[in-house]
Regions:
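Aromatic- and glycine-rich beta-strand/loop motifs that create alpha-glucan
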Residues: 1-24
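Secretory targeting signals
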Residues: 29-32, 119-171, 175-180
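Transmembrane helix boundary and interhelical loop/hinge segments in multi-pass membrane proteins
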Residues: 88-108, 122
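Long, hydrophobic alpha-helical segments
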Residues: 71-96
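Interfacial/capping segments of alpha-helical transmembrane domains
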Residues: 32-54
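Short coil/turn motifs that cap or connect alpha-helices
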Residues: 113-114
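Transmembrane helix segments
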Residues: 29-37, 185-201
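Interfacial loop/helix-cap signal at membrane boundaries in integral membrane proteins
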Residues: 48-74
Length: 201
């Protein structure tokens, strides 16, 4: 593994990471602050009267707690889509960009071989996702317990975020693998992103 390449990649992707953190902050804060336990009770009654409609939007059980609310309105779609787009762009910057611009040859001319370079890019990929998911967890914990003063089932919330991290590593690995296999940018990004979106649908 190349520590120099690791530091360079982490620095070069800071701006993109901050943009996605800002997006998650915007959606996460706004949606968390929308929580109202009384509305939750009303939504439960509405879900009982129209179960098919709520099931179509992935809300079979709207719930009445803060965690149920977050699962339905954040974890059901937004916190899957935004980090997945991050995975697509990160796969491009870590692998596909070098292949597309022909600069992979310069990396291979260093003392590090293909295996070491690939290992470094994988470590960067996992670290970037870990930072994003850790930030998301801390943000939602802060918004719900400090700003809204609502109690969360901490361990259930933690397991939920660990599961989300694992899901994004899986979806992101499809994009990363696709970027490694194909030389042309339309295939390297298109195949991984396309398969990932099929999983989401």
């Amino acid at each position: 593994m190349s520590l120099t390449l690791l530091k360079t990649e982490l620095k070069s992707n800071v701006k993109m990471l901050l943009i996605f953190m800002a997006l998650i902050t915007l959606y996460g804060t706004v949606i968390t602050l929308m929580f109202d336990p009384d509305i939750g009770q009303g939504m439960n009654e509405l879900a009982k009267s129209m179960p098919e409609l709520f099931a179509a939007f992935g809300m079979k059980d709207p719930g009445s707690t803060m965690l149920d609310f977050l699962i339905n309105y954040l974890y059901g779609f937004i916190l899957i889509l935004i980090p997945f787009v991050f995975s697509i762009l990160l796969s491009y910057t870590l692998v596909a960009r070098y292949m597309d611009q022909g600069s992979m040859a310069y990396l291979l001319n260093t003392k590090y071989g293909r295996k070491a370079i690939l290992q470094t890019q994988i470590v960067v990929f996992v670290l970037e996702h870990l930072i994003l998911m850790t930030y998301t967890t801390a943000l939602l914990l802060f918004c719900s317990t400090i700003l809204m003063q609502e109690s969360l089932d901490f361990w259930r919330f933690l397991y939920l975020n660990i599961d989300l991290f694992c899901l994004h590593i899986f979806l992101g690995s499809l994009c990363f693998f696709s970027a490694c296999v194909f030389n042309e940018i339309r295939y390297s990004i298109g195949c991984g992103a396309g398969i990932g979106f099929l999983f989401l649908l």
